[in-house]
Amino acid sequence: MGAERRLLSIKEAFRLAQQPHQNQAKLVVALSRTYRTMDDKTVFHEEFIHYLKYVMVVYKREPAVERVIEFAAKFVTSFHQSDMEDDEEEEDGGLLNYLFTFLLKSHEANSNAVRFRVCLLINKLLGSMPENAQIDDDVFDKINKAMLIRLKDKIPNVRIQAVLALSRLQDPKDDECPVVNAYATLIENDSNPEVRRAVLSCIAPSAKTLPKIVGRTKDVKEAVRKLAYQVLAEKVHMRAMSIAQRVMLLQQGLNDRSDAVKQAMQKHLLQGWLRFSEGNILELLHRLDVENSSEVAVSVLNALFSITPLSELVGLCKNNDGRKLIPVETLTPEIALYWCALCEYLKSKGDEGEEFLEQILPEPVVYADYLLSYIQSIPVVNEEHRGDFSYIGNLMTKEFIGQQLILIIKSLDTSEEGGRKKLLAVLQEILILPTIPISLVSFLVERLLHIIIDDNKRTQIVTEIISEIRAPIVTVGVNNDPADVRKKELKMAEIKVKLIEAKEALENCITLQDFNRASELKEEIKALEDARINLLKETEQLEIKEVHIEKNDAETLQKCLILCYELLKQMSISTGLSATMNGIIESLILPGIISIHPVVRNLAVLCLGCCGLQNQDFARKHFVLLLQVLQIDDVTIKISALKAIFDQLMTFGIEPFKTKKIKTLHCEGTEINSDDEQESKEVEETATAKNVLKLLSDFLDSEVSELRTGAAEGLAKLMFSGLLVSSRILSRLILLWYNPVTEEDVQLRHCLGVFFPVFAYASRTNQECFEEAFLPTLQTLANAPASSPLAEIDITNVAELLVDLTRPSGLNPQAKTSQDYQALTVHDNLAMKICNEILTSPCSPEIRVYTKALSSLELSSHLAKDLLVLLNEILEQVKDRTCLRALEKIKIQLEKGNKEFGDQAEAAQDATLTTTTFQNEDEKNKEVYMTPLRGVKATQASKSTQLKTNRGQRKVTVSARTNRRCQTAEADSESDHEVPEPESEMKMRLPRRAKTAALEKSKLNLAQFLNEDLS
């Protein structure tokens, strides 16, 4: 009898399992003992399922329910432990199969709770089974099929549990595995971020699924991106990814807007890859291909520097030759980049890093000689080496190392005069070298100009370098004049005759034994011989002279223009164009515009644009030249010219560039009586401005994405700065943003996506520009032919965007001051335009779009009377039932607002007769009553002022706006009796104790269900 008392009933086990501190392992053992004593296991199965049903109808994640589910899964799978007998496994496995059968029959129930609990239980059962557990193939197939169906459930939580349940049923080695295919679809297309996170945590990495996992690092939700980096760090080896994938992951993660994602990248993925590289930072850099992704590599190094002691970082650069320099023969791209990045990092640490910086950097004098020797060692590409890719690759590697060595100059201490002069001299010497690679010129000039502060000194030095490069001193031989040659020949003949005569006289003297005379003749003969030899040498040798020879080859012009461009970029605008600079313009820049080499023309256009920023007259003089380049040259040069034109328009405005200028005559005795002539000049000027803007705006339709983006950015800047006001161009920008053709233009989409709200909410004038663009934009979309990409754009979505951008409540606080002085808002004017458009074409297909936009407007009470007249006319002409219902609601709302406005006006008049005690309160109420409709809507509309689409998607959820309109209607219906107050003022925050008490009350106790009799 004692043994029977110790047997635990199923009901009691379920009751005890709810308790938070209950030892579930003991409960499992106790209930297992009861199970073994029963002869008829079917009774146990049915009773177990009966009590389990009570928890399966609860959707909320109650702690008691979760504990019971956990207990049930542990108990059922406890019979599959490895130490059980084989016959027991077969016998006791019946409970698991029975439970699976029941769950699989219930997975299609109408109740969300039941479907959720079925998937949860299957997930728990499969997860609690040991590694070597086996189930029937038939049961496996049924579970697989049922959970694949539940992956398409309408409830996200059900889909999540189905994803988790299928994790042990996937076969990553099978390319046709249905589970893997379903995961690959869900991870990209499921609308719920938690479902995508669940798939990320379950999907097994393989060659097929790796791109899907990597793609989630671009997910719109921060939590998904964060988990994606964690999964990649834990489950994917670095070698499994290509270099492009590694660089892309690091670039995105380190530049992510979310700090949590950045931390996940640095803490998990970056540290994991460093462990794969055995802690060797240089080896990690080698696996990132630093030559082609130096910016990403520098970001990686800075992230690693921030978590590594400075003494440890400096250790990698201490393998020097005693001069604090890394030997040239041991320099690699990774070491050079590490050295440069570390120097910049230590420089940024101030006094703390200065001590360590001195350990890895020498004095400027020593470093200057080191840099010069390395640059001189870079080989030159000859014609025979142009086809040798290994030679070219080695040359590019050396150039990359040279770039890093040049960048290290930023970290040198140039405060000492001697070191600074030496460094400047070496930089100038390097720039003059004929073998200097062009890729290093801009880096060298930038460092040179950084050391020199004075603009005039900069101009002087750069001009000298340009002169040395373009017109170097060369020694040449000069042919003598024919007359001089003739004179030398005559002199040579004369010397020869004298030699003959002297030799004959010498023989006679010897014969006569006149030795004194003979010695004199010998000396004379020697002098004549010397004269003959010298004259012979002069005749044979050409005259050598040092002359300046001007070079006009493409490489020389490119170097000179780079020098000029870097100088112009560094010069202050207030400096202007000096005489020296004008000389460079005439001799170098303007001839470069017509060069046959595209690289030279592009640099010349860049220089011309920078010169225009220095002087307005110069800009006006050469503006037409830039326009010509913009129309006829290559794409790259067109882009440079387009940017230069927009820069000059931003600096000086459109006025200086009108070809026809009104010249007011101030001469005595001259009167301007010809008004017609002045008007014609103004018309010509206006036409000129329009032609320029038309030329620029036409590039919005260019097939070249860079030209489209440049034109859109430039026009957006002009509009935002107030230099351009054009609803037509604004309409084209909106259409360009939505156009599916620009879907891949990330920079264009991002630029316009930021521009629209900032521009619209800056002032009422800008909102009026959007108001004017409203109807033309929608009409363009409505009239677009089926073959046009514009036909794919959702007109309703565009209308919602424009309505939100013109909301009076969205204006900046500074801009709202001007709004208060005007009776009608932008939405009021827009409402009138929409109503008139509906009356113009009451049967148009766009009537529903207009009606929906009309119902979303924030209308003031001042407009109610006039708008009601138009609405009555519209109701008589429009036949569409959907539109009629929406218009009726608008009419009712306006009638209420009109009535309230009249009552409030009377109340305001009565308020002026009250005592001074209540005067301030009455004035406050009067302000609230002035625009009751706008007052209620303003607070609720503030949440919907964001853009309705960021990437031109066709369908957009509009539930937020629907809820806002519902709340507005409710507020308006109650405003007859009380003053409408902002919704935010009615919210109260409950104290922590009240929240705790409410939570305790909400906890579900299953005892009342378990006490019911079995049916």
From Swiss-Prot:
It is found in: Nucleus; Cytoplasm; Chromosome. Its main location: nucleus. The modification Phosphoserine is found at residues 390, 674, 973, 975, 1002, 1015. The modification Phosphothreonine is found at residue 931. Phosphorylated by CDK1. Its phosphorylation, as well as that of NCAPD2 and NCAPH subunits, activates the condensin complex and is required for chromosome condensation. Pfam families: Cnd3 (PF12719). HEAT repeats lie at residues 94-131, 138-173, 174-212, 238-275, 276-313, 399-436, 439-478, 617-654, 687-724, 865-907. GO terms for biological process: cell division; mitotic chromosome condensation; positive regulation of chromosome condensation; positive regulation of chromosome segregation; positive regulation of chromosome separation. Coiled coil: none annotated. Regulatory subunit of the condensin complex, a complex required for conversion of interphase chromatin into mitotic-like condense chromosomes. The condensin complex probably introduces positive supercoils into relaxed DNA in the presence of type I topoisomerases and converts nicked DNA into positive knotted forms in the presence of type II topoisomerases. Component of the condensin complex, which contains the SMC2 and SMC4 heterodimer, and three non SMC subunits that probably regulate the complex: NCAPH/BRRN1, NCAPD2/CAPD2 and NCAPG. This is Condensin complex subunit 3. It comes from Homo sapiens.
